Amino acid sequence: GSLNEVPPVQLASKVLKALEKRNNINTEDVDDVVLGCVHPIGEQGADIARTAVLESNWHQTVSGVQVDRFCASGLEAVNIAAAQVMSGQSDLSVGGGVESMSRVPLGSSGGAWMADPTVAYNSYFVPQGISADLLATKYNYSRTDVDSYAVSSQKRASEAWKDKRFKNSIIPVKDQNNLPILEIDEYMRPETTMQSLGALEPSFEKMGKSGFNDVAILKYPELEAIEHVHHAGNSSGIVD
């Protein structure tokens, strides 16, 4: 996407600067910035929250910490920032998330869960896509169910954008010459139909047949087979 050439620290710092400007914040009053970040290595490593604080020219007393809970990283960061305020530990904390899947690809940080054969075997490890299809099978979500929800979601997103419901939540990403790089979500496809989605092949069927289906069924023996219902049109995308 359009953001593939923008370093993640720049994405984060642009948001912090906009937050300061829009809310007339005296950054000296901010106690902490908590940012969720999957695979906090390379350009996203070395505590990207604190790095973004420095790049944003916020007050030097503002601390920063990064959190990695995979897909829930940003939400977890917001929860932590809120908990700091609720507990009285902080008067003002900022919570959010940043990541560039184009620049720091999925799986970059490795880890024993999938790389160590003993750990993978003992934990019945399967890739996330297989897990998604497993859950759909276990809880009776058919291909029609997930495709119809995707169609509805695309239309809702487009209508919300047209109604400017996100105008106070989104800023354009601009380059060093103040020229726009991205101003609108590229992932919205309001023209999506059940027919167009029906032409897409399941993304994880071949992977499942390679052996991961058997691993999943070992863990969930109540299932006789895994129905592969997810594909690029009804799943989250790499949106940077």
Question: Each PLM stretch: what is its role?
Answer:
Residues G1, G45-A46, R103-S109, E186:
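Short acidic, glycine/serine/threonine-rich loops at helix termini
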Residues G1-S56, S63, C71, L134-R143, ...:
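Conserved active-site "lid/cap" helical segment
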Residues N4-K14, R22, S148-V239:
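N-terminal extracellular/periplasmic Venus flytrap/periplasmic-binding protein-like
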Residues V6, C37-D91, G111, S123-I130, ...:
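Conserved catalytic cysteine-centered active-site region
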Residues I41, S100-S102, A157, G237:
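Glycine-rich nucleotide phosphate-binding loop and flanking beta-alpha elements
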Residues V67-V98, A136-F166:
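Active-site-proximal alpha-helical scaffold in enzymes
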Residues M86-Y139:
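Flexible glycine-/small-residue-enriched beta->alpha junction loops
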